[in-house]
């Protein structure tokens, strides 16, 4: 790992466990909000490892692939659809876009925000904060947990259309068979649990050599 976050080998947990600073929470899991209206940071919750908490697991719940081929006459249509469900990722890219106001997710900058959670007395949070505090003050400066997203993604990985040239057309050629194909790769994806305006593709995420995401 690096900074305040990274992977950790924790007894009884997957090797893909991610640790970092976390949002302070009540005993029933509600986020704790401080007097200024921002999230509190609590490093002593969940699994304490080197003063940091468990903030995610990069291992997906499951991966499914659907491949099919349809042939009619001399024409063949093939596709490969992939679904990766679950797993967490830490993204400095999305953090920067949101924190710096570079995505449509941060429009209406003059509107006040009220973060979901409770105050120290247990009452629902009613503290209003501005756009900059919401995204920069919490997402960039706040706990690592806020920069961790679900990495689920649906993807149309491959599509191909092939035409087999009739053999009679090749009688006067040295070729016994010929085909013409058009192929496309990574034509569509939807990382449906990431901010829409970031257009983020979890497949490009990585921390170099290691087991992070």
Say what each PLM segment does.
Residues 62-68, 75, 156-161, 213:
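Hydrophobic, lipid-facing positions within transmembrane beta-strands of outer-membrane proteins
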Residues 15-17, 86-175, 179, 184-185:
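Extracytoplasmic gating/loop element in the C-terminal half of outer-membrane beta-barrel translocons
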Residues 70, 79-83, 180-186:
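Transmembrane beta-barrel strands of outer-membrane/channel proteins
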Residues 72-75, 175-177:
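Strand-connecting loop/turn motifs
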Residues 1-58, 98-99, 115-122:
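Conserved small-residue
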Residues 1-2, 94-103, 193-205:
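Flexible, surface-exposed loop regions and adjacent strand-edge segments
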Residues 74-79, 168-169:
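Repeated loop/turn-to-beta-strand initiation elements of outer-membrane beta-barrel proteins
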Residues 45-54, 59, 107, 111, ...:
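Extracytoplasmic loops and strand-loop junctions of Gram-negative outer membrane beta-barrel proteins
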């Amino acid at each position: 790992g690096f900074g305040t976050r990274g992977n950790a080998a924790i007894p009884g947990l997957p090797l893909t466990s991610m640790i970092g600073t976390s949002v302070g929470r009540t005993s029933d899991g509600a986020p704790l909000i401080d007097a200024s209206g921002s999230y509190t940071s609590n490093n002593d919750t969940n699994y304490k490892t080197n003063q940091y908490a468990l903030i995610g697991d990069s291992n997906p719940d499951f991966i499914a692939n659907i491949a099919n081929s349809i042939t009619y006459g001399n024409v063949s249509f093939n596709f490969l659809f992939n679904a990766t469900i679950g797993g967490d990722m830490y993204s400095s890219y999305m953090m920067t876009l949101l924190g710096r106001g570079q995505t449509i997710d941060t429009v209406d900058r003059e509107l006040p925000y009220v973060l979901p959670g409770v105050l120290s007395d247990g009452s629902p949070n009613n503290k209003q904060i501005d756009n900059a505090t919401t995204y920069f003050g919490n997402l960039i400066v706040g706990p690592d947990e806020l920069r961790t997203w679900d990495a689920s993604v649906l993807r149309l990985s491959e599509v191909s259309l092939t035409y087999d040239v009739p053999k009679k057309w090749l009688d006067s050629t040295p070729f016994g068979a010929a085909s013409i194909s058009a192929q496309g790769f990574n034509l569509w994806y939807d990382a449906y649990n990431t901010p829409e305006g970031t257009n983020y593709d979890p497949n490009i995420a990585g921390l170099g050599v290691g087991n992070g995401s």
